[in-house]
From Swiss-Prot:
GO terms for molecular function: dUTP diphosphatase activity; magnesium ion binding. This enzyme is involved in nucleotide metabolism: it produces dUMP, the immediate precursor of thymidine nucleotides and it decreases the intracellular concentration of dUTP so that uracil cannot be incorporated into DNA. InterPro entries: dUTPase, dUTPase-like, dUTPase-like_sf, dUTPase_trimeric. It comes from the Bacteria. It catalyses: dUTP + H2O = dUMP + diphosphate + H(+). Pathway: Pyrimidine metabolism; dUMP biosynthesis; dUMP from dCTP (dUTP route): step 2/2. Its EC number is 3.6.1.23. Its cofactor is Mg(2+). Pfam families: dUTPase (PF00692). The keyword Acyltransferase does not apply. Substrate binds at residues 65-67, 78, 82-84, 92. The keyword Coiled coil does not apply. This is Deoxyuridine 5'-triphosphate nucleotidohydrolase.
Length: 153
């Protein structure tokens, strides 16, 4: 198991926790002095009250919580939000309200998930052409939306 250093910047901060035994993401809670109202089609920056020190070669991703998205149309506009290994500031979550009603965030509300993952650094080798493939430049829905297409692999 990977050990990650964490500092509680606010004594009221709730540290990230896995809600279930096999959860991939840890729930991240809002650390607020007063409620925050996210109006329809607006954003709010929500503090977590903690900072982390990731080992080199890792990142943390902040992702939306499915229940907030399903029931309230609350998401993260920059999902997944990346926390780099050299960032030492407070973890903050940008929430966006895609719904038609104001959404109130209270202290302790679980507003995002955080997944820690290994990151591979790459070196780009500039060439004049790329190898051909059966897909070529097909993208943006080129396989359609109906049914479950049979794999051609």
């Amino acid at each position: 198991m990977l050990k990650v250093k964490i500092v509680r910047l606010n004594e009221k901060a709730l540290l990230p926790v896995y809600a279930t035994t096999h959860a991939a993401g840890m729930d991240v809670a809002a650390c607020l002095e007063e409620n925050v109202v996210v109006l329809p089609f607006e954003t709010a920056l929500i503090p977590s009250g903690f900072a982390i020190e990731l080992p080199e070669g890792y990142e943390a991703q902040l992702r939306p919580r499915s229940g907030l998205a399903l029931r309230h149309l609350i998401s993260l506009p920059n999902t997944p939000a990346t926390i780099d290994a050299d960032y030492r500031g407070e973890v903050k979550i940008i929430l966006i309200n895609y719904g038609q009603e104001p959404f109130v965030v209270h202290h302790g509300d679980r507003v995002a998930q955080m997944v820690v993952a290994k990151v591979e650094r790459v070196f780009f080798d500039e060439v004049l052409t790329l190898a051909s493939s059966s897909r070529a430049d097909g993208g943006f829905g080129h396989t359609g939306i109906a049914g479950n297409p049979e794999s051609k692999a």
